[in-house]
Every structure is written in C-alpha cells, then in structure tokens.
C-alpha cells in the first residue's frame, strides 16, 4: 500500500484543502490520502474550532471520496502531537511500501525545526503543495494548487465561495459567532 499523509489544523477546512487532496490523488502513485487534523499544532498556542468539530467537518467533506481516510489519532491524543509520532503510528497500522507527507509551501521555512526532522525525512518523502509567494527547492516533489486560500483569513472573514458547500453555512455561523 502507498499512502500520503496530509496533516493540518484545518481551522477551518476549505476548498484549497480539497484541491490539494484531489491533486495528490491524481499526481502521486498512492492508494489513499490520509487526512490527519491536529489537536493543536505544536507551533501554535490555540485553536478556534474545537478538534472534534474540525474532525466532523472533514468527515462530512470527504465522505464521497473512497480513497480518502480521516484519521483521528492526533485528536484522540488530546495534546499537541509531533508529525513523527503520527508517521510512526500510521506505519505500524498500514505498513505502507511508500509514504508521502504533504505540506504547504508555507511550512518549508520551518520544516527543519520539526521534532526529529532528520528521522522523519528518512521515513517519508515530503510533497509540497505550492502557494503563491513561496519558492520550492527542486529536491521536493511538488503539487501545484492554484487555490490560494488562507484558513487564517477565513477565520476573520469567512466567505462561502472558499468553503466546501456541505459545511459552508455551519462554518460561517461558527466563525461569525
């Protein structure tokens, strides 16, 4: 089995995340994309939508995708979880022949600061989803995504056109309340 892990806060999930998953399924030689919402990103101090709410939104959004799995491993831990922990858990669970780890190009400048980065880089092949304004070194596999949407901006100004229709109204109500 070959899998790609796509971790993130998904606070909120948006059409850019869907575009990344679709491109990964089209361009990578994989059986599944496993989406792993964080409980709390180790580089952040808080979240706005609760982990369980973000998990529920992701399950609704990706229900029609038979090659996408939503993994609640980090949410169940109830604490910030390092990528290396999640990778080791998923390696034990699936024993994949190939393991990709999808990151946004905005994560590249701090990737070397990730916990046990050297070990992690030997266990996975990083795939970088491009975003405007970030250069991607040739050593990384790349997925081009043209939807330049920011979860940070959507928390401040939720806009329906950037949100998955199945959860758009719920997300807008949540962030406007």
Curated annotation (Swiss-Prot):
EC number: 2.7.7.18
One GO molecular-function entry: ATP binding
Gene Ontology biological-process annotations: NAD biosynthetic process
Pathway in which this enzyme or protein is active: Cofactor biosynthesis; NAD(+) biosynthesis; deamido-NAD(+) from nicotinate D-ribonucleotide: step 1/1
A Pfam family recorded for this sequence: CTP_transf_like
UniProt keyword list: ATP-binding, NAD, Nucleotide-binding, Nucleotidyltransferase, Pyridine nucleotide biosynthesis, Transferase
InterPro entries membership: Cyt_trans-like (IPR004821), NadD/NMNAT (IPR005248), Rossmann-like_a/b/a_fold (IPR014729)
Enzyme class: transferase
Record carries keyword Hydrolase: no
Catalysed conversion reaction: nicotinate beta-D-ribonucleotide + ATP + H(+) = deamido-NAD(+) + diphosphate
Function: Catalyzes the reversible adenylation of nicotinate mononucleotide (NaMN) to nicotinic acid adenine dinucleotide (NaAD).
Family membership noted in the UniProt record: Belongs to the NadD family.
Name of the protein this chain belongs to: Probable nicotinate-nucleotide adenylyltransferase
Organism name: Nitratiruptor sp. (strain SB155-2)
